[in-house]
Amino acid sequence: MAINNNIIGEANQPSPHGGEMVRGFKNVFVKPDEQNRACSSYAMARKRRMKSNIIFDLGRILVGLDNERCIAAFERVGLEKIAFYVREHRVEDLFLAAEVGDITTPQFCDEVRRLCQCSVPDTDIIWAWNELLTGIPDAKKEALLALRRSGHRLFLLSNTNFMHWDKCAADFFPYRDSEGHTYTATHFFEKIFLSCAMHLAKPDPTIFTEALRQAGIKADDTLFIDDREDNCQAAQSVGITALHDPEGEIWYK
């Protein structure tokens, strides 16, 4: 599946943070030779706005999230207290500690057991926590491959924990196309940046500057796509153009 070129958003908006906010993909991905060649000045203007590098968020932008399913899973394994905390968006310190790699997966499970005063095994805790994730549609994987084939350099930058990443890498990213070619996460992205491995998290601007440095790319030639506006603003603050896509639907449809 290629990017839907019928999406026509507003023009790129200058941002007080330094980068730009993009409302649609047509100004970013469509190559000038795909436009009316007679409109040379228009095509050149579009070419100047194209970005060579695209940094994707993971949650909602690629993988679906289902809070209620996660809550039901914790209740199913007898962790009603954690289910309540997830519903009320509490225990942020525990989840954040896992997200920035301050605690290991076994330590996360130990803390869950301590909070619940129970002996639920690690496997059940990890299963319930991973029920937050619902998968990656094949259409999104095809769109990523289409972008790579068109010459874009793709990167992933996610606030995530090792449990969720392991689930995504093992079960959601693997893909076989219509010609029988198989792909894994590393085939879609040139580099993968995880908060739990970097000990940094969005919206800290440092995670963006570090990703740019490790990738060897320039902010002014890079687009960042995220479902959260504060993360987009942080990217803009270091000169990256941002696309705020709250439901993860704009970028590929």
For each feature predicted by the language model, list its residue ranges.
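Asp-based, Mg2+/Mn2+-dependent phosphohydrolase catalytic module
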Residues: 31, 47-51, 56, 161-162, ...
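Intrinsic low-complexity, disordered N-terminal segments enriched in polar/charged/small residues
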Residues: 2-4, 31
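Intrinsic-disorder-associated, low-complexity terminal segments enriched in Asp/Asn/His/Tyr and depleted
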Residues: 4-6, 12, 36
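Non-catalytic pre-domain segments flanking phosphatase-related domains
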Residues: 22-30, 34-56
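Generic structural signal for small/hydrophobic residues in well-ordered secondary structure
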Residues: 57-60, 101, 147, 156, ...
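N-terminal helical cap/lid subdomain that shapes the substrate entry/recognition surface
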Residues: 48-142, 149-150, 161-165
